[in-house]
Amino acid sequence: VEIRCGTNGLILINELPVERYLCKVVPSEMPPSYELEALKVQAVCARSYAYRQMTSYGYPEYEAHIDDSTAYQVYGNPKPQERSTQAVNATCGEVVMYHGQIATTYYYSTSCGETTSLEAWGTPANDENGYLQAVEVSGKVGDYEKDLPWYRWEAAIPVQTLSTLVEQNLGKGLGMIRDIQVTKKGPVVLQIKLIGENGDATVDTENKIRAALGGNGYEIKKQDGGVVPSSKLLPSAFFTVEKGADIFLIKGGGYGHGIGMSQNGANEMAEIVEFFFRGAKVQMGTG
């Protein structure tokens, strides 16, 4: 462990073996109570993602590849979890490969019944990312996650609240928002047009769209009746918008960016890697 002085405080730089790193990442990213096969796949995906990030420095000024947040993978400090460690040990060295290269195995919490492709982030499909396709997360009995709280959700946002948030999030004085138009759709919403009394604004890609409509000040109701306060990002970009007299009703599904593996979907099924990452295979890595 190395400690350096940063602009806003101390920076702790932790260098450790990948397998030890994973013993903290897996329980931070997926509940240890999940099916062992799902935990194993989480370990393989987290390992693959880590090796891909090791090809360059995410923080070159500190010679660090990643940080411990959701910007990369959550590396928390939970107490040792036997089942998570078992999953890491059982898959030791295994990674997801595509066309001879370690795949960038993105994952997220919950799907709405389908995933999306890298188009959601403005990246066109090519020979290197062909494993990140939009797939239906369903079987003979329907969508695997249909009974989970975040499978469907909705938010009734007062026009005044949304108008204030949009101004804060975009830094543009559009005034009162009169309409939200979905102008491009993937499976996820890829572009929206915000029409205000003082002007319009177009927002592209799922993360920027979720950020534009996110923020504190309203509530999100999950399909099980649970209500949670809004946060800096809309739960997902799988949504529709309805305009009422004084509210915008956003009806959505899933939680997270929607690219790659749905963690809750993985917990509900068997052949996981080949399902979410089309054309990819689990193999022993070279790292």
Regions found by a protein language model. Name each.
Residues 1-287:
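Conserved, single-site charged/polar hotspot
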